[in-house]
């Protein structure tokens, strides 16, 4: 077993001098962890879908406290408000097994492991395992992108593949803390659109990029699977304080994730899928201007009047930024976007 260094990327704000709110959150988590362990809870690992390329893989998982003997499936079914009251385990060692090679990594202050490791895996889907010293072994799917692939899909989640009410506070709280995946509604035609895109572009990676918290990852994964969306990695964030602010910026999370994908896969041109409620047009436009060779097109789902009100209005941008090299398509549903993408030669 080899020891890997902690990633230079700092997804949970583990700076040397954390913000006052982050220090208070750490103390609160430590208090809750001590109480939970007195009740007999032990660590369990919730594994998320990872991705990579020949030579490396990005591993994503989270360590929480659960009853001894709780299976990974049972832990994943914690939903609604309970997912946000679960106790994370920070700074715990996690063993990652990739093709028989084991490495030790460390969870961040939110219990999240987000690390890139060397791996000798061929293109396609693979299974790795993750565990702590006291937990059962958990499996995680990872998708290794073929170096010859030149097309990929990045899709927003809220109001793009799933009808939500974010960010209106009361409805956002209801959707996040109460509803499970059975009560969430898919956007008409979007699952078919993404499935057609993956058939038209074999081997294309699919990334679901959201400002949602890691707590809801199991619920979102079950929703996407139940609605027959293509399998892919979820890139979520931590809603808590960071080393320099009270709350993490969702927009910065999306911008940084897109820039990272452009660096990790310089040969891929991404189809960016989002909606016109708030910031997707602005975020995608900025990325297309900064990385024109990394964008094949931008597909924007147009919200209905009622959805736009619930989402806090439409984008304030005076139309999407028009990069000379980027095609933009707009439609209210997946079928309309598919028709326009077909005309553009992407379907």
Residue ranges and their predicted role:
Residues 1-141, 145, 334-336, 341-347:
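Intrinsically disordered, serine/threonine/proline
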Residues 2-15, 212-347:
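C-terminal cap/substrate-recognition subdomain and adjoining C-terminal extension
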Residues 133-135, 147-148, 187, 195-203, ...:
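Secondary-structure boundary elements
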Residues 136-151, 157, 171:
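Short beta-strand elements
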Residues 151-166, 284:
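Asp-based phosphoryl-transfer active-site loop
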Residues 161-185:
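Short, flexible helix-coil linker/hinge segments at the edges of structured domains or between repeats
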Residues 180-204, 214-218, 256:
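Short, acidic loop-to-helix structural element flanking the phosphoryl-transfer center
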């Amino acid at each position: 077993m080899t020891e890997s260094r902690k990633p230079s990327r700092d997804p949970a704000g583990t700076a040397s001098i954390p913000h006052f709110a982050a220090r208070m959150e750490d103390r609160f988590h430590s208090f809750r962890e001590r109480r939970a362990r007195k009740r007999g809870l032990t660590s369990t690992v919730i594994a998320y879908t990872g991705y990579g390329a020949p030579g490396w893989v990005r591993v994503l998982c989270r360590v929480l406290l659960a009853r001894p003997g709780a299976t990974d499936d049972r832990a994943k079914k914690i939903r609604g408000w309970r997912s946000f009251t679960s106790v994370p385990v920070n700074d715990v060692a996690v063993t990652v097994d990739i093709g028989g090679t084991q490495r030790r990594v460390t969870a961040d202050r939110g219990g999240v492991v987000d690390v890139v490791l060397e791996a000798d895996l061929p293109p396609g889907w693979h299974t790795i395992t993750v565990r702590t010293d006291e937990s059962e072994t958990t499996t995680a799917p990872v998708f290794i992108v073929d170096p010859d692939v030149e097309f990929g899909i990045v899709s927003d989640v809220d109001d793009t593949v799933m009808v939500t009410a974010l960010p209106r506070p009361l409805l956002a709280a209801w959707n996040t803390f109460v509803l499970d995946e059975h009560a969430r509604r898919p956007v008409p035609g979007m699952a078919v659109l993404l499935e057609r895109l993956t058939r038209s572009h074999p081997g294309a990676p699919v990334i679901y990029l959201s400002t949602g918290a890691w707590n809801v990852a199991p619920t979102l994964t079950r929703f996407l699977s139940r609605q027959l969306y293509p399998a892919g990695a979820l890139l979520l964030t931590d809603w808590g304080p960071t080393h320099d602010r009270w709350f993490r910026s969702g927009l910065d999370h999306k911008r940084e994730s897109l820039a990272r994908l452009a660096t990790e896969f310089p040969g891929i041109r991404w189809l960016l899928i989002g909606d016109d409620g708030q910031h997707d047009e602005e975020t995608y436009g900025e990325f297309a201007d900064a990385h024109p060779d990394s964008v094949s097109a931008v597909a924007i789902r147009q919200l209905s009047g009622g959805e736009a009100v619930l989402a806090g209005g439409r984008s304030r941008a005076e139309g999407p930024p028009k990069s000379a090299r980027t095609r933009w398509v707009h439609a209210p549903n997946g079928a309309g976007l598919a028709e326009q993408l077909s005309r553009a030669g992407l379907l």
